[in-house]
Swiss-Prot record:
This is Maturase K. Usually encoded in the trnK tRNA gene intron. Probably assists in splicing its own and other chloroplast group II introns. Belongs to the intron maturase 2 family. MatK subfamily. It is found in: Plastid, Chloroplast. One of its GO terms (biological process) is RNA splicing. Keywords: Chloroplast, mRNA processing, Plastid, RNA-binding, tRNA processing. It comes from Clematis vitalba. GO terms for cellular component: chloroplast. InterPro entries: Domain_X (IPR024937), Maturase_MatK (IPR002866), Maturase_MatK_N (IPR024942). The keyword tRNA processing applies. Signal peptide: none annotated. It comes from the Eukaryota. The lineage of its organism: Eukaryota, Viridiplantae, Streptophyta, Embryophyta, Tracheophyta.
Amino acid sequence: MEELQGYLKIDRSRERDFLYPLLFQEYIYALAHDHGLNKSILYEPMENLGYDKKYSLIIVKRLITRMYQQKHLIILTNDSNPNFFFGHNKNLDSQMISEGVAVIVELPFSLRLVSSPESKEIDKSMTTLRSIHSIFPFLEDKLLHLNHVLDILIPYPIHLELLVQTLRSWIQDAPFLHLLRFFLYKYHNWNSLITQKTKMILFFSKENQRFFLFLYNFHVYESESIFVFLRKQSYHLRSTSSRAFLDRTHFYRKIEHFLVDFRNDFHTILWLFKDPFIQYFRFQGKSILSSKGTPLLMKKWKYYLVNLWECHFYFWSQPDRIHINQLSNHFIDFLGYLSSVRPTPSAVRSQMLEKSFFIDIVIKKFDTRVPIIPLIGSLAKAKFCNFSGHPISKPAWADSSDSDIIDRFGRICRNLSHYYSGSSKKKSLYRIKYILRLSCARTLARKHKSTVRSFLKRLGSEFLEEFLMEEEQVLSFILPRISYFSKRLYKERIWYFDIIRINDLTNLS
């Protein structure tokens, strides 16, 4: 463990010791504003400050001074109007400064990445890896040769002070860390949102989005440090990275940066875990570690990771958060798909002179399916159907025009079809389409105070022509020269490289 601690400190010699003075620089807040924090406000209302939508050094100084006046914070709890604090919006105060803090705290990391000699080469390679679908061809190529997977939920710190102590290894500016600690305790519920999938949207809330995104990225960045030096023991460990996934960028670049700093004396310590076939991939708080090793080796991996996170990183990691599964009889729930490696038996007829015989062989096939039950649950939460999958009308959209209603339903249907174009079997997708189509018809019938049957009989089904467009028609537009094969292509898995975010219904499922 001492050798591991020494290794992890190798690249931490470039800390910026003086970050706190940057809080008083106006250009920091202008930078945070110009980088497009959606719906963020870097100034208080004019009636509160008396300034014409400006932020200045005086404002920032006053905000920081008020935030450190703990007595006033205590008095505030008994105030009848807790949203304002000496005539100012307390939430807006913290939001304004936290946006500046988010920009400043990223400096030690961004400067390291820019100065890295491999950064330009990595930037070029990222242009082809922006799509979420780019990970699935990689899985199809690699998982066929592996046997077991570790399904891991990344642990979270048990106390906020531990996160501050970890940040101290990168940032040694005490006043800045003190202010950062204030924000961590102000938003004390952030650590409960990291690994709970149902609350991921709350985690990336409208307020302080960049600040919390950095904390999450840094947390994952530290938890994945173990794979940096294990990469030398497992030469095939790779990471598919993309600028669209901010939480994966640091891991890829950290691997490239640490290549020259690896220490050979770890060879004798980690010999039990040397595995030439190991793959690691992650999205948000869930990661998958796959290997060709035996179940005993996977149990050693599990024991090793749990103890490493608890003893070195002080992360609370329950053993039941890591599940060992066999690829041949288990689905991997990842990025909205249920992926597995299924053995497919086949018979080969061989002819030798006058004799012929059959040879039974088993070929592994990468299988991806649509998770129908979670998707129906997501549609039920969005009020398109009940939890049994029975379509219902959407009353909230009944006030819109007919074309707007059809366009909304059609857009959702096409987006789901586009996202799940890589599914091996499309029957589940047909059921989702049926729910959306009938929900659209019920919504229109509700608007016109009619039944679905009479409404369709009176207007016909032509008004749903665009909504009912099948994927083979879409492929004929995308690939006009090979439209003859579009129907055949539709039956195959198709991965699109223009999908840069996971589907909302998929993410909520």
